[in-house]
Amino acid sequence: MTRKRTSPIRAVLRFAASVMMVSGVLLIADAALTLAWQEPISAYLAAQDQTALKHQFLKLPASKVRKHRAQLKGDAIAKIELPAIHQTSYVVEGTDTGDLRKGPGHYPDTPLPGEHGTVAIAGHRTTYGAPFRHIDSLSNGDRITIAMPDGTFVYRVYKTKIVDDSALWVKKKLSFDQLILSACHPLHSAA
């Protein structure tokens, strides 16, 4: 029995096809693992962080947040309630990756609730408990309550807008008090 010899071009094409098939399988496996493993695990870890933040928030002296805010980076400073989307979370000071893994984060360069200007808070829509997963479902008139150690502040949604991730103007101080909530869009994207 004689065996036909394959041409070098055919061998290269066969190898390339094999590499592409294996790559495709790996990409699908990565997506499946992300949904089946990473999201539930990160949600579990975020729930543990939120429990710790709750205890931290309940012990926080009323004067500490406003006077020593810089020292509270990564610590609980507030509780945010968004009844329209059935979400309650503890807010940390800061918006770095580590801060946002714990829960929504207050932009340090913006005022705190109760201070004049634009209060800005960021949160994840996917992973780490996804506190702002349904932020796109908020409608005009929906209530947002932020409890601080020294008082409770109620805001109403008056506008929703999708902006580019470089739109830092949304945090600009205006002549009136407002709250800006920010999260990545579309769902499952990250800026």
Residue ranges and their predicted role:
Residues 3, 8-191:
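Solvent-exposed, non-transmembrane regions of membrane-associated and secreted proteins
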